């Protein structure tokens, strides 16, 4: 087949006429160095602090150092195949994660991608991981309780909705167990939960997820995971991602609870990134802004007022306040709470629960030290019946600790001192509680009432646990209406007091424990 010159020229004219030119402006740069997950990029202009930079292979890096001639970025993922000379692109976007109800019951990574093998997640959109905390005018005071299900916590260190309560202690003192029990206790309360696991073993996280599933608490919980094998950047960003997912519920007039397990490992990951970016180290080799790292995160946990929720939802939700309660966890070394990160977080939060190794090893679990554990705002939110009854518990324990120290040096004690010691021992025993066995407000009130009104006097110390178990079983079977009333109202009046006295007198007369 031969083409003549006219056909060739017509074909060329046709191609020229249909040729479409599209121009695309791209902010492109070149990798000039790669080391330990940190890349240095030349040629990128107009880059924001915290901007996502697109790398080859559908990966991203986070711009953290903006210098005159280069950009220092931390790779969010594997970096072994990155090399000098590769082209990268600025996206013009800050890091965002998916939010919405579709995340409940799922296990996701720092970027909100599912890692539980249950398929794609239906989200309600994306939100930036770094959001400025609500202002002073947008907040409301904390006056509603959040029940952890632990007698020792709800009676002595009460937590309110929108509070930040630090759980601090050495390794293996029950910090995670306390936080997981608090999540399990919310399964029927309507409070949505977020559990952020930072720098933990994958097997430990799998066990936590399994326990949440066993106790039917996973359905209202989002689990955000950055394991010990994940990049330092992902461990550093995980708490912010989880906080954004929790804020979705707060801003729509609902209540949410978030657990950061733990912020010590996040600080270590941030220190690693900062040192690799050649930022000047300070105390304990942490960078100068490690306080701001945690303060900007924990300030986002708050209770917001009605006008904030109405403005955010554009009038769709009316007359509701929202809250995000934070339970950050800090691991101490040999009980040293005066280290850099623990003191920072103690000063940021609204109280702390100290878990002591010697109490844990002596069999007191949860190992809460009532002497130095405080809640700075939770008292206003405490359920009335528990608040009224628990005042004497803290005093009894404080006096017991003081007298027990003196009793070691003296065998000759008067009757009043001996009675105080016996009462303190029994109250300490009563505060013990098994894991995965949270108690309702009514059950806690009944247990505290029995101690406060002297019903433990004739019960041997070794039988306190059996006494409590039998008392709860008896109350549930014979006085369920009374327990329901206390759980619904939380009030304490003469009628409730008389009913509790009657219940305990009848029960103690049976001696059935």
Curated annotation (Swiss-Prot):
It catalyses: ATP + H2O + 4 H(+)(in) = ADP + phosphate + 5 H(+)(out). ATP binds at residues 169-176. The record marks 373 as: Required for activity. Its EC number is 7.1.2.2. GO terms for cellular component: plasma membrane; proton-transporting ATP synthase complex. Keywords: ATP synthesis, ATP-binding, Cell inner membrane, Cell membrane, CF(1), Hydrogen ion transport, Ion transport, Membrane, Nucleotide-binding, Translocase, Transport. PANTHER family: ATP SYNTHASE SUBUNIT ALPHA, MITOCHONDRIAL. Belongs to the ATPase alpha/beta chains family. F-type ATPases have 2 components, CF(1) - the catalytic core - and CF(0) - the membrane proton channel. CF(1) has five subunits: alpha(3), beta(3), gamma(1), delta(1), epsilon(1). CF(0) has three main subunits: a(1), b(2) and c(9-12). The alpha and beta chains form an alternating ring which encloses part of the gamma chain. CF(1) is attached to CF(0) by a central stalk formed by the gamma and epsilon chains, while a peripheral stalk is formed by the delta and b chains. This is ATP synthase subunit alpha 2. It comes from Photobacterium profundum (strain SS9). The gene is atpA2.
